[in-house]
From Swiss-Prot:
The lineage of its organism: Bacteria, Pseudomonadati, Pseudomonadota, Gammaproteobacteria, Enterobacterales. InterPro entries: Integrase-like_N, TACO1_YebC-like_2nd/3rd_dom, TACO1_YebC_N, Transcrip_reg_TACO1-like, Transcrip_reg_TACO1-like_dom3, YebC-like. Keywords: Cytoplasm, DNA-binding, Transcription, Transcription regulation. It holds the Pfam family TACO1_YebC_N. GO terms for biological process: regulation of DNA-templated transcription. Belongs to the TACO1 family. It comes from Pectobacterium carotovorum subsp. carotovorum (strain PC1). This is Probable transcriptional regulatory protein PC1_1817.
Length: 247
């Protein structure tokens, strides 16, 4: 598929924000603890835990830190009253936005999320208002330089749904989220080292952002990611290379 890897661009932008790395680690640890508490400490039988482990490793978390978080979840933890909450809304330019949270206080969390939407010209929606536009999938991303045919053959044989190659040579492998770990293992075994790997919500449609709405969308994402309870922010905003250069 022709095009430029907007997915990769977003990931690179987030990865470059080193000042947020401590907060990112805190959120990943919270997800590891919760996933282990709810589904057990074996990633082979706990897809949510496997996804959290791959995300932790993609963000260069040490195995010691990762294993301690899993042990906390399996052994019972002070975060035992955490629950997953999904908020849906509309951002600048009519973008569809989903906000995944882990919280022990729904009132606090919804207040912070609503504030971010309101400050950037968006509004919080009701359950189901935008979720139908997204599909939960595994995404395994490769930097430019790999053999496209080798990645495609290994991925499809392992059960991937789709392989997308971009103009810059970057490759994204999309998988059913339930079998994400198995596909990742098969690609690793084939000697294909991923740049990042995680379970995400992939939009079925895109909303084009212009020079006016793109900065507002970026501000909304930043405000949401700054909330301690927010784990992930998904959206269908599409920012062209020309507009991105102006940000």
């Amino acid at each position: 598929m022709a095009g430029h890897s907007k997915w990769a661009n977003t990931k690179h932008r987030k990865a470059a924000q080193d000042a947020k790395r401590g907060k990112i680690f805190t959120k990943i640890i919270r997800e590891l603890v919760t996933a282990a508490r709810l589904g057990g400490g074996d990633p082979g039988s706990n897809p949510r835990l496997r996804a959290a482990i791959d995300k932790a490793l993609s963000n260069n978390m040490t195995r010691d830190t990762l294993n301690r978080a899993i042990a906390r979840g399996v052994g019972g933890d002070e975060d035992a009253n955490m629950e997953t909450i999904i908020y849906e809304g509309y951002g600048p330019g009519g973008t569809a936005v989903m906000v995944e949270c882990l919280s022990d206080n729904r009132n606090r969390t919804v207040s912070e999320v609503r504030h971010a939407f309101t400050k950037t010209g968006g509004n919080l929606g009701t359950d189901g208002s935008v979720s139908y536009l997204f599909t939960k999938k595994g995404v395994i991303s490769y930097a430019p330089g790999l053999d496209e045919d080798a990645v495609m053959d290994a991925a499809l044989e392992a059960g991937a749904d789709d392989v997308v190659t971009y103009d810059d040579g970057a490759i994204d492998v999309f998988t059913p989220w339930e079998t994400f770990g198995n596909v990742k293992d098969a690609l690793d075994a084939a000697g294909l080292k991923a740049e990042s790997a995680e379970v995400s919500m992939i939009p079925s449609t895109k909303a084009d952002m212009d020079a006016e709405t793109a900065p507002k969308l970026m501000r909304l994402i930043d405000m949401l990611e700054d909330c301690d309870d927010v784990q992930e922010v998904y959206h269908n905003g599409e920012i062209s290379d020309e507009v991105a250069e102006l940000l």
